[in-house]
Amino acid sequence: MEHTEKSKGPAEKGLLGKIRRYLSKRPLPSPTDRKKFDHDFAISTSFHGIHNIAQNQNKVRKVIWLSVVLGSVSLLVWQIYSRLVNYFMWPTTTSIEVQYVEKIEFPAVTFCNLNRFQTEAVSRFGIIFFLWDIVSKVLRLQEISGNNTGSPEALDFVASHRNFSITEFVKNNGFYLNHDTLVHCEFFGKTCDPKDFKHVFTEYGNCFTFNYGENVQSKNKVSVSGRGLKLLLDVHQEEFTDNPVPGFADAGVIFVIHSPKKEPQFDGLGLSSPVGMHARVTIRQLKTIHQEYPWGECNPDIKLRNFTTYSTYGCLKECKAKHIQRLCGCLPFLLPGNGVECDLLKYYNCVSPILDHIERKGLCTMGTHNSSCPVPCEETEYPATIAYSTFPSQRATKFLAKKLNQSQEYIRENLVNIEINYSDLNYKITQQQKAVSVPELLADVGGQLGLFCGASLITIIEIIEYLFTSFYWVFIFFLLKILEMIQRTSPPQTV
């Protein structure tokens, strides 16, 4: 007898025994109590139709109400499923709004001479066209060049001019802006001069920007449509020249209209005005707002180090600069950032091949949300309409020839007249918007719950509470059964 009690002791004091004793103290409802619990829930829940099933004594009515409830639940599930599918397709709508204002900010205007270099300098360094094409390659959006850096003449020049600075050469021997080349400048009735323009390097060499930077944006506004910037430029054809082989055979001015917060981008986007022409440009301000992924393709988390305002063009320049600086140990002067400037030998041996490598491998891509440079979330553009007329007239030719002390032929072959005005004092906002927001989705789902089942969030909580309680009882019941089976099948312990 004593031996039997000692053998039972460890089993009762084991972990399973303790769990069983603890669970056995939790009272489980009897089958009658469980039926009463189910019935009370059915007649008290705010889920419409269930109490009609529970309270009706007529079997036919029970079946009818059961069919109604099941049908309503089926329709509810179908409607909610379709709403969720539609939401996760991330649909968008586009709204267009026109805002009228008393004053409107004037854009930046960057212009360049189509004849990029001084004739005298080109006569001494004829290779400059080829060299500049290699150097300015960093500004092009997409291009994979052939093996064009292997010209013997170019290689000889690079080898014999190790200290040659193409930056200083272009700055000193490219197009310049002074009172001779800027014959007349007027902005909204006020005279402007070369000091109001900022020098920038582009693929066209020396270029000049009016109204560039955030510090001047606030003061350069116009309050009357039809009045803006007027420029009369002298391109000095006899002093500046270009290589007609790659397509620089025109004479005149190329210009681009852009946001004061963004750098000029000429790659296929410039407007041009030939000599002997008056270009009348009317513009409108268009603001575009894109949604972030997954509704749109923009990424608001991307910030640029060298630009206050994000743009795809600025992002691509920083991306190229990062790869070139890492792989070549230098930085092209046309790209943003701080670093040792690349010399011509670096351009030949490293920068140009790396640019081809970047393009082939897709290291600097643009457009979609997962690209290196997705579309900006906000951008301002200036769609332009341009009209030309012959300039100057015969009488104006005589007047300008006398004023500038030049021949009439010189006036016709060198002067370019550009006028840029707003068509209206308004701007258009094109905004991409979420077709279905989270509050709208919740409201729609709530409406479906109310329409088909007369339910609400409180009803859902009631159902969750009912299911949790029922599951808890079933779980405790089966757990006790399992523990009892384990103790029965465990071998007896012997001393």
Curated annotation (Swiss-Prot):
Pfam families given in the database record: ASC (PF00858)
Transmembrane segments: 62-82, 460-480
Cellular localisation: Apical cell membrane; Cell membrane
ATP-binding keyword on record: no
Gene Ontology terms: cellular component: apical plasma membrane; plasma membrane
Disulfide pairings: C112-C207, C185-C192, C298-C377, C315-C373, C328-C350, C330-C342
Motif (GAS motif): 454-456
Catalytic activity as recorded in UniProt: Na(+)(in) = Na(+)(out); Li(+)(in) = Li(+)(out); K(+)(in) = K(+)(out); H(+)(in) = H(+)(out)
Family in the record: Belongs to the amiloride-sensitive sodium channel (TC 1.A.6) family. ASIC5 subfamily.
Protein name per UniProt: Bile acid-sensitive ion channel
Native species: Rattus norvegicus (Rat)
Gene: Asic5
